[in-house]
């Protein structure tokens, strides 16, 4: 019940052009608000640092660099986006990693607010649910540099210019 109410709330915010940034579950909620599918991925868990290719739309928003490295922890994934939405970052594991859904909605599957230490602790806490080889690969990936600051800088500008 509460998820459908949250989806309706996001749709309302979008209709009146109030800027919103969604993280992980928020990314999935925005997909539902745009009548897209969210499903448990056949690829399994995504944990650790995910490397994602930036698109031209991402550069148009002010992103820099060749890739977007960000911590993830998810099984569910967005399965499609509307034609009018802009794909910002993608990977083979998560094709719709970051999306600008409209002039006021933008979201990401990753966690720009997390530290590597938190991700490591969460993976260790979930050893009963996540396959050992997935956790080991996730822990090894934590050595990759994160792009959180640059990402959050672009998102801050997006939110402030729309406010």
Q: Where are the regions that the model predicts?
A:
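Amide-donor transfer/coupling interface in amidating biosynthetic enzymes
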Residues: 14-15, 54-163
């Amino acid at each position: 019940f509460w998820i459908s109410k949250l989806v309706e709330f996001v749709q309302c915010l979008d209709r009146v052009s109030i800027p919103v940034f969604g993280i992980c579950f928020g990314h999935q909620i925005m997909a539902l608000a745009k009548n897209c599918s969210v499903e448990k991925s056949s690829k399994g868990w995504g944990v650790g640092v995910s490397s994602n290719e930036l698109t031209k739309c991402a550069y148009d928003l002010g992103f820099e660099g060749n890739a977007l490295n960000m911590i993830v922890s998810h099984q569910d994934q967005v399965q499609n986006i509307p034609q009018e939405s802009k794909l910002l970052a993608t990977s083979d594991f998560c094709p719709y990693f970051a999306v600008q859904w409209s002039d006021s909605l933008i979201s990401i599957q990753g966690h720009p607010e997390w530290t590597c230490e938190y991700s490591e602790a969460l993976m260790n806490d979930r050893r009963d649910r996540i396959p050992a080889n997935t956790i080991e690969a996730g822990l090894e990936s934590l050595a990759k540099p994160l792009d959180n600051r640059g990402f959050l800088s672009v998102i801050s500008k997006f939110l402030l210019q729309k406010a």
